[in-house]
Amino acid sequence: MDSKLRTPNSELRTLWEQDPKRTTLPLTLDEVLSQVQSYISRKVLFWGERAGEISSYVAGWLAGKGITVIVLDGANRFDPYTVSSLARRAWIPPERLLKSIRIARAFTCYQMATLMGERLVSLVHARAVGAIHESLLQKPWVILLGPLTTFLDEDVSEREVRPLFERSLRKIEGMASEGVPFLLFQSNPPHPPLRKGEEGRFMSSKRVYLMKRLFQFSNLVWRISLDEELQIVLEKGLTEKYQMTSTQSQISSS
């Protein structure tokens, strides 16, 4: 089974078949995931275009490796059909991969904070116990899809969002320190509507704050771009020691 999932890049391209110009990666997804797997402290962010589709593919790819996956979906973008399609192309029964993936969805920032806090602890424990006979050392991998999306709700003030988001990050940090790997997938957050007065500035401030914190929190940051072709580019790694990247500077000045 492993040999059929060793080069996911060719399979991932089917997501972009409608555009023949977008068919190559300067660094293959397989190479990216191999780096992620060998990284000790795994809080890895993939951000940019089509993050939801790529996260669905990665969940199936990990499940195909025999890894238990938990998906917390705050963007309502996880697609089980992508997993099924990957399984069929690898000659694996789709049910086998789907059974290894547990999905929990959130539609408000309060629900997302609960998932990232108390709920995730119980999910990881339950999945670890269920997989104990398969691997005594293997911990479930957690995919956070759209970790910022619900927190960008215009109806929730920045004063409420900041402590809620910070508590959620502390929960994730604690679990990551215990060896639970986290992959975060965030599409480009929408720019605030152009408005006159304080409300427009308020939304811009919240968006900048959330993006900055997500970048600072993540050990590795990969940017997904579809300008000319599909690209996955490393923007932050070990040597940067949590410093803000040039992309973060661009965000803060926008």
Q: Where in the sequence are the language-model features?
A:
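Glycine-biased, low-complexity coil/linker segments
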Residues: 131, 195-199
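Phosphate-binding/switch region of NTP-binding enzymes
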Residues: 166, 172-191, 199-254
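Structural motif
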Residues: 45, 141-145, 183
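Conserved inter-motif catalytic segment of the P-loop NTP-binding fold
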Residues: 74-154
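Alpha-helix N-cap and loop-to-helix initiation/capping positions
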Residues: 156-164, 206
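Arg/Gly-rich low-complexity intrinsically disordered repeat tracts
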Residues: 2-13, 132, 243-254
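Intrinsic disorder
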Residues: 9-10, 128, 135, 202
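The Walker A/P-loop phosphate-binding site
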Residues: 2, 9-88, 93
